[in-house]
Amino acid sequence: MNTKIYKRVFALAGELMLAAQERNQINFDNCYSELKQLCDDNENTDKDHPVQWETLADFTDDLPLAISIYEKALLKAEEINSKDFRSSIGFSVASLQVELGEKEQAIENL
C-alpha cells in the first residue's frame, strides 16, 4: 500500500475516533467525507487497497451500508490474496450480521 495514503487513512481514523468521543458530528462528517473521497479517488487504481475500504466501513453507522463496504474491501483483499485482511474483514461483517439478526450469514463469514 502507498505509504502516503496509509498515513492519511491512519490519521483520518484517529480524527474520526476523536470526533466520535467528543460527539462532534461536524468533524466526524468532514473526516468521513474525506475518507470516502480518498477511497473513491483510489478505486480501481494501483493505489486501491482493502485497508482504506475497511476503515471506511469501520466508521459507517448504517449497518447494511457498512456491510456492503466491507464486502468491497473483502474483494480487494482477495485480489491481493491477503489472509490477514480477509480474516479481519470477514469477522467485521459477521459481527454486524449478528447485530442485524442474520446469524446464519454471520457464521458463513467466519
Locate predicted features.
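Structural signature of alpha-solenoid helical repeat scaffolds
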Residues: 1-4, 41-44, 81
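Structural signature of alpha-solenoid helical repeat junctions
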Residues: 8, 27, 44, 48, ...
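TPR repeat positional signature
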Residues: 8, 12-15, 50-53, 90
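Amphipathic alpha-helical segments of tetratricopeptide repeats
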Residues: 36-40, 74-78
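Short terminal alpha-helical segments
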Residues: 3-25
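Helix-turn-helix repeat elements of alpha-solenoid scaffolds
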Residues: 22-34, 60-71
